[in-house]
Amino acid sequence: MEGKVVNLSYEELEAILLTVVSSNPKKEELQNCYNVLKDFKKNINSVEQFLKQIKMNKNDKIRQLAAILLNRKIEKHWPNFNDQIKLEIKKLLLELIRNEKNYLVSKAVQFICLDFENGRVI
């Protein structure tokens, strides 16, 4: 059975990601976060929300997790974006790599940019 596709605001996604990266989350809370993220990633708007977290969040762990989660789903959503949106995403990813001070976050964003057989991202 497929889960529902959910939409999250910046703040809602931030709270979920913070729970996941926190040092001692409760098992039930963590499982709930995983379930919400699983459904959220089905939404094409998740790409924009993950990019916002990577760009704007002050917590390195949240930015890194957002990049990892985006990397896992962008391939699915990429064909649904028009050329202008693809170009904007490419520019933003390059900007994020160029400006990121945290090595692990930068590496996670770089993995998004890796080319694959179908010509994803860059």
Segments predicted by a language model, with ranges:
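Alpha-helical solenoid scaffolds in large eukaryotic transport, assembly, and signaling factors
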Residues: E2-I122
